[in-house]
Amino acid sequence: MYKTRTILYILFTCFTMTALGQHTGHSVQIFETSASGNKLKQLSPSAPVTGMVRVRLKPAETFQTITGFGGSFTESSAYLLGQLSTNNRKKILEAYFSAEGARYSLTRTHINSCDFSLGQYAYDTVAGDTKLEHFSIAHDTIHLIPMIREAQQLSKDGFKIIASPWTAPPWMKDNNDWRGGKLLPQYRQSWALYFSKYIQAYRQEGIPIWGLTVENEPLGNDNNWESMHFTPEAMRDFVRDHLGPQLRRDGLQEVVILGYDQNRGEELERWARILFSDAAAAAYFGGTAVHWYASTYDYFPASLQYTHRQSPGKHIINTEACVDAEVPKWEDDNWYWSKEATDWGWDWAPPDQKYLHPKYAPVFRYANDIIGCLNNYVDGWIDWNMVLDKQGGPNWFRNWCTAPVIVDPEKDAVYFTPLYYTMAHFSKFIRPGAKRIGFENTDTALQLTAASNPDGSLAVVLFNPGETDKTVALSWEEQETCTHIPAKAIQTILFTNAKNQHND
């Protein structure tokens, strides 16, 4: 009798959503990407079972405001798009930016060249030109700017752009080289002016720059490709004394300045402490940028929480992540779900840090990292290249990586890897201005995050990395619905208020 009563109770609670939906105007949509082959496939709520995982959403408990999700505009990606047919070029950009696609809302690009450029270049190569009278972004008008403009035309809601320099022009540096070295003191003001001129030049092209990072990977990259070194003290002083005041003088004070821009972990904590302990400098910093390369599984929650405490109310944005040190696997979905990928640390990490770099499944790493970051105050998450070729380039240093979309220009072929769909589970449904919300979860093996969107909808992303299926009962307010999530699968559940559906 007790077992019968329990089953009847489960049946009632799991189908309450339908009955209440008719009364309150709420509905539920479920989308799934899985190792078994689903790719953002829309599903129906499932039948209940005994022993379900229970997740209670707590919309009244709010955390950071979401800035967005997306990828990066690089010269390599832009060049490849230009090698494809018009139809395939449009297909890719629509997949990333249109209302029917992933709806990317936060992006990044490079100031001057980076390793994912066709070669090394800067906007002013005239040595000693302190007033930057020869400054020009003409190089970017060949590939990069056309790609951004096309994306703008396809994006209904628009998107933000963060711009990052890998290096100043060599003539501004103490080693007169694209790689390594430091900014010479006599060129600090010229370098600040360089940022301002870049922002204004892009605005003249119809492209607003929302934010800047002061330097991509200021700790360096072993001088392999474009880089310039900063200590946290030097970055703090440069922003306080030069970059911040320059942008303010030029009426660009609304542009968000993000500090650090390298890996999470102990270094992040040291940088956050130094950058934000100086009140005058902190007034110019809008937040912190981080990368994911310090580990293939650890998102360093303690470091993210520490950074949040050091800079409450300011941004923490993951500005770069990718499957590095791997040539892309062409039309092999299974590989992206398999624990076969290695990263730079697999071979090159110091012995005491090797444990942070085991082999991993790319989809797992993406989902785990984004969920972990969101649950620890990160408000934006940006992937690296949007498009690469079958070699993992073009990259002038041969630093091959994988992107969510891989192309073969010679055959005019396009491959949307499972990473594209993984990104879309977040970018398409958790919108700018959303608030991350609290939840209770009875199964720690089931990863999830949840957010309340500005239109009143609730988005919940579930990730089941395990080998067994799960049935999950999701409840909020007086509503409850069930979803069956298979092993090795991601689901987004969208609770939508019918009266607001026209806003999507």
Task: Identify the meaning behind each predicted range.
Residues 428, 439-477, 488:
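Carbohydrate-binding surface patches
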